[in-house]
């Protein structure tokens, strides 16, 4: 079994242009993601999946491995699939982990957990954990993708709206979850994903994982206790800077996987 971590990154985000190279404590965001990914145990390779010369120049300067991909890839997962394909990680026993390029504070144990979750279910081709929503303002934030999961550790649905509905929840018993933007795929299943046409729910919600849900493919899903802090808008940088004040992973960034 081989494990590959791919970090998709793109400069042309309409919500936050030039986001990957935004400095956080003097270091570009994607470098934080890359260095943290390199701290994950039992990983054979870590690469960035990019499509722009500016990011390629940054990768050279910062000594980060990368794969150039097609600018026209429709989603981050499709870009990850192209990178995995070019590196030969397409077998059933290959594990490809997608760590989004806007997750600068992702704890390495979360990435390890996503791989373990996939291996727990031999009949499943993809795994994507969730975390509890403790700040109820996130329910109205369309950048935070809300999730519903089954009692059997399967992802039922993803949406940018508040879910489940709390209109009848007079005792405040509802528990809310959001997607963690780290997911794992078996190598052959990731290529199968890339061959599927985008679905209408995927396009309406702007959530690529709905391609699997709408085509009835199970997604292993479990709750993590570690918090992640995605960067969707410029104001999120302040949150990351606060988190980094007590971060234990930054001092370990000098450990690099080849």
Give the role of each language-model region.
Residues 5, 46-48, 96, 127, ...:
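Hydrophobic/aromatic residues located in beta-strands of well-ordered beta-sheets
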Residues 11, 70-76, 226-228:
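Short, acidic/turn-prone active-site loops that include or flank metal/cofactor-
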Residues 106-196:
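Conserved core of the sugar-phosphate nucleotidyltransferase
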Residues 2-50:
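N-terminal glycine-rich phosphate-binding loop and ensuing alpha1 helix
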Residues 174-258:
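Conserved alpha/beta core of the MobA/IspD/sugar-nucleotide pyrophosphorylase nucleotidyltransferase superfamily
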Residues 50-51, 101, 106, 185, ...:
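A conserved hydrophobic position in a structured secondary element of the catalytic/binding core
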Residues 53-116:
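Short phosphate-binding loop-to-helix
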Residues 43, 91-93, 121-124, 217:
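Short, high-confidence coil segments that cap the C-terminus of an alpha-helix
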């Amino acid at each position: 079994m081989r494990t590959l971590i791919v970090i998709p990154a793109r400069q042309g985000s309409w919500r936050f242009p030039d986001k990957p190279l935004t400095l956080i404590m003097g270091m570009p965001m994607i470098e934080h993601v890359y260095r943290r990914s390199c701290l994950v145990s039992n990983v054979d390779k870590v690469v960035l999946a990019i499509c722009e010369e500016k990011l390629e120049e940054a990768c050279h300067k910062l000594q980060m491995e990368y794969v150039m991909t097609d600018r026209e890839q429709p989603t981050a997962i499709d870009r990850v699939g192209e990178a995995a394909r070019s590196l030969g990680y397409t077998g059933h026993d290959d594990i490809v982990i997608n760590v989004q390029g806007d997750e600068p504070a992702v704890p390495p144990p979360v990435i390890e957990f996503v791989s373990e979750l996939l291996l727990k279910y031999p009949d499943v081709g993809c795994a994507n954990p969730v975390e509890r929503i403790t700040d109820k303002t996130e329910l109205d934030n369309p950048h935070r993708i809300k999730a519903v999961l089954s009692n059997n550790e399967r992802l039922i649905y993803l949406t940018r709206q508040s879910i489940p509905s709390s209109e009848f929840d007079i005792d405040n018993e509802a528990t809310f979850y959001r997607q963690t933007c780290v997911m794992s795929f078996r190598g052959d299943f990731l290529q199968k994903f890339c061959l599927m046409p985008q679905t209408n729910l995927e396009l309406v919600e702007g959530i690529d994982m709905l391609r699997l849900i709408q085509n009835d493919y199970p997604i292993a899903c479990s709750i993590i206790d570690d918090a992640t802090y995605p960067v969707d808008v410029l104001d999120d940088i302040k949150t990351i800077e606060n988190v980094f004040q007590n971060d234990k992973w930054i001092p370990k960034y000098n450990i690099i996987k080849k």
